Each structure stands twice: as C-alpha cells, then as structure tokens.
Amino acid sequence: MSKPSNTEVTIAEAESVKEEKKIKLILDRAKDHGKLCPVRDIIHRISDKWSLLSILTLGTHGTLRFNTLKKEIGDVSQRMLTVTLRNLEEDGFVSRKIYAEVPPRVEYQLTEMGQGLMQQALQLADWANTQLPQIISSRNKFIKNK
C-alpha cells in the first residue's frame, strides 16, 4: 500500500478543519441563543413518530386534504395528525389553506422550507438504507457481547 501524497493529506486536513469549524459554529450558536439550540430544537420537533412521515407524504403527493393525508400515512390518529400538522405549520414547514365551503375544506402542502427539509430527510434515508447491514451487524455483535 502506498503512502498518501502531500496533496491528499492536505485536502483531508482541510476537510477536517472545515468540518471542525462548522461544528464549532453550530455549538456557538447554541450558546448564543441560550436554551434554543437550532439543531436540538429542530431535531426534537421533527423526530417524533409522525412529522417526517407527514413531510414525506406531502412531498410525494403535493397538496392533500386532511383525511387523505391521514389515510396515506396510515395508523395515525386524527388528534396526533392535527398536533403534528400544527407544529409543522408553526415552524414553517407546512402551509394550510382553508376554503370557505360547506363542508369546510382544508388543504396542506409543504412550504419551500418544508421541501428543503424533505430533501435532507431523503439524504438521511438514503444513508440509513446504505448503512443498514452494518448497523444490524453492529447491533448483533453488541447483543452477543452483553
């Protein structure tokens, strides 16, 4: 096996420094905003059982009415979907449009920011699918060593 060239080492070091700076910036922002850490706050908000499913479903289907969205997601209760959509709307990921009709019609769709979040969620899902065999292997080794 050959030694890495000076150029390869320099590029790797530069990437490492860039990542360290990015992490430091994120952690410094958390300190500057007191208890509002942007990473912790957003991850907490979207890591519940229904938020990402709602975002991915709206991203796949576009504009949906409440009952259609509920049906597409599956076994979510009406109350939990209502709470989830309110939280996503409050954070600016989902928009809600109410039509003055009888019966009332309410439609939901992703905002531009919600579409951006969906793209990030898809990258995470791709990574998880790629890493799944290794994760399962690690879990099995951990269980055997307990």
Name each model-derived stretch.
Residues L64-Y99, P103:
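Canonical helix-turn-helix DNA-binding module
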Residues E101-L124:
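Basic, amphipathic "hinge/linker" alpha-helix immediately C-terminal to the N-terminal HTH DNA-binding motif
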Residues L56, D91, Q120-I135:
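Alpha-helical linker/hinge and terminal dimerization helices associated
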